[in-house]
Amino acid sequence: MTTETERATMSYGIDPERDSVAFARYRAHMDVIRRDRPTVALVLSGGGAKGAAHISVIRYLEREGIPIDLVLGTSIGGLVGGLYSCGYDGEELEAIIRGLDWDNLLYDSHSRRYDALSQKDYDRQYQLSIPFGTYKWDFLKPETSRRSLLRDGIVQGRNIEDLFSALLVGYGDEVDFLSLPIPFACVASDMISAKPKVWHSGNLVEALRSTMSIPGLFTPVKSNGMVLMDGSMRNNYPAEIAKQLGADIIIGVDISSPSLEASQMRSMLDIVIQANDVLGRESYNAGLAVTDIYIQPHLNDFSLLSFDKESIDTIMQRGKQAVDAAAEEINNLKVRLGNPYIRRSHNPLIHRATNLNRTAVKIDSVVFQGIKDKEKRYLRRMLHLENDGERVIHIVELEEAISTVMGTKAFEKVTYQLLGDEEPYTLQFNCFRAPTNQFGASMRLDSRDFTSILLHYGINTHQLTGGRLDLNARLGYNTRIALSHTLSSGRGVEFGTTLSFQSVQNGDFRSSSYNFRIDHLLNRAEAHIAFLPWRQMSLRMGFQLDYLYVTSILTDINLQTDEMEYIDKENVFPSPYMTIRHDSFDDPYFPTKGVLYQIRYNMYFKGLMHDSPQTHAIQFHLRSALGSGRLTLLPRVDARYVSNDLYPYVNMLSISDANKTLDQQVTFVGISTPYTTMKMLSSAGSDIRLRLGKKHYITASAQVLHEADSFGDYFDKELSQWHIGFALEYAYSSLLGPFRFNVHWSDLTRSFGVYCGIGLDF
């Protein structure tokens, strides 16, 4: 015959029969403790950043010697309670919550330095990127190959899961939560059955991740046919469950937000909070009814995301004030429990969790889940884990490994687990595939090119190895369409071919003496081999065949006599080339540290249609970022030498990095129209950038240019020329890309100019 408590249990959760058996085991455990004294449960509600108040309560209870036999938690209460149950005391919990980088945790921040150069270029140019997988030649598994374009959450929660894995070493396998140093349970919400999921056994990391999956922010946890979201949607204050598990005395800490009036709901987060309140009100009221000591800090002026240092300090202080106010009730509890207090919860025979952030551990094997054998071999080589064997591993190594794998963009999420309850552990990487295909789009509006649009369509773009196909189109005054095929060997070498078409229809150029306009078509066939020894550097060698067709020349001078030695209406130029490139900037537009450099050499053979001399061209570009606080110094050096004035490979200046008509153009501040220069040029300059707030920037720029027609002339004051340019710019980092407005001057123009634009550079 079942008791009333058992009947309530059987009708409560998503799996009533399994829950009933587990709950009975918890009650049996409590019966053993009850032989000496009443049993005590600590119930911690959800409330985001306000969960710091839980730690103040825990520290007080520890100081007063109150035994805790069971911990129940929801959302952040589940996180704090889960760690406490695994052996972390209040002092350690406070150190953890104060030491966390919450921006990194909540938004899955990923450092740009782990991305390949090709991915850095892509991210720098495209505002919109939509992965997809809908083709039969897509190598994704059938169950994951047809992905919706809509995300089920902003953040995958990878960094949160990795934090749990680091803090819970020794409990990475399936575990019975009753066997933890303090028995524990937490609540999540199943979106399929609309019922709560009571976690009393299973993967502890998965349980903690699911109980705090805030709707709309974190993606749900999909487990055994369930789609689990934040437990606050069904039971944000699980005191009633604590009673069902056998607790005699319940100490409850309630940090939930009060119900909102219509005028108070001003954001999506407010709506989520109110919806959770409505859905979980019945269980909340039931929990209040069975609570013996109710602690409610005054935290209405804080939100779920108030994780800044000042807020955490205040929240913890408010928690201390709230538990101090309950001192009389807690003293009465001490009397009821008797003296001495028999603390049976922390069993000395049960090991506490290891904190990988403080202690390195031994592993003896590495396994990968979710990928094919070929991809496993590729990742082992990438991470230098070709051979198993006992070794010591640190948290820094694991974070580097995860970031490196995520940098391939082949996975939506990669997490790790340390399996086993003692050393040496098995290190398991869990890889969740991303769609391999991709569509990208970008647009820029500016005072030079007016409107420019960039489109990308990629097949197998995010494969670890094998071939990929990319179609890129730049639309506007200077249209360029390119079709590329790349084959990756998986060993740091790739082979590629490209066919491209470019139409330059806005080719207004100037020299120090003349103005002219040249419109042309440039079709190119290219093949290359690239060596990628590091993520931030590449060596590329190849051969290109250029077909040039000049469609229009407007000028009042004889260009072939006065300005360019060799310009044909139609010609074909074959050219081998080599490029070395490095990019370690932490941000493509507003870097504060890192170096960007490129060296390129081309040898243009004689024209195949019309005679032209063999021409050599070598170009060097270096830019670095030296940031300190809000101020960043960005020195730059450029140089280019071309042995003949062969159009379109002549030396040419660009007004900005965003407005390069030809690949070889060198940016020079202070001009409003592209300028041609003599065969040898060098320039040096620097930007000084001041950040105002989070997204506003003021930049002062100065640059010096030196040009000549030969090495000998370069050092001759009479035969070489010096130029100088200045600019003052305001920029705002918007969702569409940087908005820029600058005023500039140079002695080339001897007048002030204005540039205005919004969008990414491409």
Regions found by a protein language model. Give the residues of each.
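C-terminal hydrophobic structural anchor segments
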Residues: 689-723
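A generic beta-sheet turn/junction motif
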Residues: 192, 420-422, 626-630, 732-736, ...
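Patatin-like phospholipase
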Residues: 1-74, 82-403, 407-419, 431-435
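C-terminal soluble interaction/assembly domains
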Residues: 389, 396, 716-719, 731
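Short glycine/threonine-rich loop-to-helix capping motif typified by GTGT followed
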Residues: 610-613, 711-717, 754
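C-terminal outer-membrane beta-barrel translocator/porin domains of Gram-negative envelope proteins
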Residues: 438-443, 576-693, 700
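Gram-negative/organellar outer-membrane beta-barrel architecture
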Residues: 395-397, 401, 413-585, 653-667, ...
